[in-house]
Structure formats: structure tokens, C-alpha cells
Amino acid sequence: MLREGFDHGFSQADWDAGKEEARKAMIERAKVRGMITYSDLVKQITSIHLEAHDSRLDHLLGEISSEEDAADRGMLTVVVVHKVGDMQPGPGFFELALSLGRDISNLLECWVEELRRVHAYWSN
């Protein structure tokens, strides 16, 4: 989820490095049509310290998804899911999906469609 003027508290260089680490981890999972949990993703980010339930992680994922979608690669963060329970992305993903023009009237359908789009792009 993106927030205007959000202060993440890191230098821009460190933030960008963390974003790239997260992006690469998600791409690796998408290439094999896989997914990654929020807690496993934050372990892959070493340039900055984030926790799985950190609002800064939400913003980082929002930036990545917006950039990837603008590049016609879909919302890459669709591969990041809860470890337990519904095994789907959190509510911030769907809020951003709506702002990017996705139909979220059926969350499961929205998620599956976006997951297929991202997997198809990266696995080819």
C-alpha cells in the first residue's frame, strides 16, 4: 500500500537497495510459479531491517507493485502471502489493486488472476 509523503526512516540508497533485494526474491519465486511468505521475504532483505508486520514493508511492497505494474509485468507482490490462514496477500495488496484498476469484488478471483499474470510473465 502506498502512502503519500511516507517517511520510512531509511536513507534513499538503503531503501532502494532493500527494494531491489525484495524484488529479486519475488522474481525468483515467480519464475518457478511459487509464492513467498511475508516473514520469509523480510529475511531476504538485508539492506534495511523490516518485520513481517511492519507498515514500512507495506509501503515498500506498494512501491514495487506500482512500478512493476507500470512496466506491464503485473503486480509482482501478488506472490507475497500470509504464512497461515488464507495464504493470500494482505489487505494492502487489494487496496492497491483497486487503485490500479483491478476488479476486487471477488478477492480470491482477483488474486488468482493476478498471480497467473505474474507467473506467466516471469516463468517464460
Residue ranges and their predicted role:
Residues F6-R23, E28-N124:
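Nucleic acid-binding interface residues in structured DNA/RNA-binding domains
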Residues M1-G5:
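Long, low-complexity, charged/polar intrinsically disordered regions in eukaryotic proteins
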